[in-house]
Structure formats: structure tokens, C-alpha cells
Amino acid sequence: MSNLFKEVRKLIYIIVGIAGILGALSRYYLGLNITTFWHHSFPLATLLINLIGCFFLAWLTTYIARLNILPSEVITGIGTGFIGSFTTFSTFSVETVQLINHSEWSIAFLYVSCSILGGLIMSGLGYTLGDFLIKKSLTEGDYS
């Protein structure tokens, strides 16, 4: 393994780690702010955070990654580090189990449905926006 390759791998670990810290802190801060005005059993904070993450990950991988304006290490840091720690499948799963354990079946069903369908819709919107911006860049000659 070459020294350059080892250095790049170290850099990726550092970028993903720092981005992960920032993503986790952002999720925590946003979650706190949402729960200050939302006082119902439906886990709105986690749902909104995960939907935002779905949109931005799809947009990132469709638009930013294809533009070649950022090094792949930074794209990995943003996608895996920031967005990966910003979104939370485990919290979604635990909150769903808690709703079921409290016999809040309709809220659990609504939460799972909104999470899955909303995630697919937001990912689709992020992809569509990214694809639109790529095509716009191509027609304007900004794409490298």
C-alpha cells in the first residue's frame, strides 16, 4: 500500500469523523428545537430529521458528487459522516417499538408509513433537483 493511499485513507477517516460529530450535534440541536413546540406522542423530530437527510443525501449524490467540485473524500465525509449521523434509523425503530408497547398502534402505523413513503418521496425530490441542476449546468456550459 503506497504512502499516498495511506494518507488519503487517514484523511477520509478524519473528515468522516468530524462531519459525523457535526451531523450528530445538528440532529440533537434540531431535535431539541422541534420538541420545544411539539408535545405529542408522534415523534415529529425524528421524522423531519430523517426526511431532511433523505433529501440532502439524494441531492448530494446526484448533483454535488457529479459536478466534481469537491474531492471525493469530502463527499464521503458529508454523506457518510454528516448525513449518516444526522439521520437515525435506530431512533426511528426504537420510537416505533415504544409506540407499539404503549398500544399506540395508529400512531406507530402513521409514523412508519410517513417515514418510509416520506423518505422515498424526499429522496426522489432530492434526486430530481440534483438531476435538474446537472442538466441546467450542462445547457449553460458550467459542468466540468
Swiss-Prot record:
Keyword terms, alphabetized: Cell membrane, Ion channel, Ion transport, Membrane, Metal-binding, Sodium, Transmembrane, Transmembrane helix, Transport
Compartments, record wording: Cell membrane
Membrane topology, record value: Multi-pass membrane protein
Catalysed reactions, as listed in the record: fluoride(in) = fluoride(out)
GO-annotated biological processes: cellular detoxification of fluoride; fluoride transmembrane transport
Signal peptide: none
Matching InterPro entries: FluC
Presence of the UniProt keyword Ion transport in the record: yes
Assigned GO CC terms: plasma membrane
Binding site for Na(+): 84, 87
Activity regulation summary: Na(+) is not transported, but it plays an essential structural role and its presence is essential for fluoride channel function.
Stretches that traverse the bilayer: 11-31, 44-64, 74-94, 107-127
MF terms in GO: fluoride channel activity; fluoride transmembrane transporter activity; metal ion binding
HAMAP family: FluC (MF_00454)
Functional description taken from the UniProt entry: Fluoride-specific ion channel. Important for reducing fluoride concentration in the cell, thus reducing its toxicity.
Family listed: Belongs to the fluoride channel Fluc/FEX (TC 1.A.43) family.
Name of the protein: Fluoride-specific ion channel FluC 1
Source species: Bacillus cereus (strain ATCC 14579 / DSM 31 / CCUG 7414 / JCM 2152 / NBRC 15305 / NCIMB 9373 / NCTC 2599 / NRRL B-3711)
